[in-house]
Amino acid sequence: MALLDIVTYPAPILGKPCKLIEDIDEDLVCLVEDMTETLYDAPGLGLAAVQVGVDKAMLVYDVAEDENSESTGLKVLINPKIVHTEGKVTSENEGCLSVPEFRADVPRFACVTVEGVDHEGKPVKIDAEGLLAIVLQHEIDHLEGKLFIDRISSLKRSMYKRRVAKALKAEG
């Protein structure tokens, strides 16, 4: 296993939809292992393949069921798709490994149903609410070429983009 570099905004790959995965092969299994190590090292709740520079529709996540549990264990979703949404909620203080040093309130659905396949190619259907619903929406957005800053007000988004441009200019 290896730690992977996390791609950050404004990298162009983050703004492009990912390619669907057709075969689960040894390379994909290695990618899952490397993404898992990277997720826990970061630390984060979820990580999409595109966030480590891989143009594949896959994500890994590990979300505690409630405040008292440590973890539900790592889950892998390949070619995930949101098939049902319900209710509205604001994800407070949402952040992202690819959008460092910025957090914002983000409008999300309160409940989602997600379908995809796991790392063994078995069909998966997840009915999620609460934090899990927010994490799944956030990571699936990555696979569709969207960042959470694309879902916030244009004023907050442009403030962040200006800050990043200024920092990049200062770096040379």
UniProtKB/Swiss-Prot annotation:
InterPro entries: Peptide_deformylase, Peptide_deformylase_sf. It catalyses: N-terminal N-formyl-L-methionyl-[peptide] + H2O = N-terminal L-methionyl-[peptide] + formate. Transmembrane segments: none annotated. The keyword Glycosyltransferase does not apply. GO terms for biological process: co-translational protein modification; translation. SUPFAM superfamilies: Peptide deformylase. Keywords: Hydrolase, Iron, Metal-binding, Protein biosynthesis. Fe cation binds at residues 96, 138, 142. Removes the formyl group from the N-terminal Met of newly synthesized proteins. Requires at least a dipeptide for an efficient rate of reaction. N-terminal L-methionine is a prerequisite for activity but the enzyme has broad specificity at other positions. This is Peptide deformylase. GO terms for molecular function: metal ion binding; peptide deformylase activity. Its EC number is 3.5.1.88. Signal peptide: none annotated. The keyword Lyase does not apply. Pfam families: Pep_deformylase. Its cofactor is Fe(2+). The active site is at 139. Belongs to the polypeptide deformylase family. It comes from Desulfatibacillum aliphaticivorans. Binds 1 Fe(2+) ion.
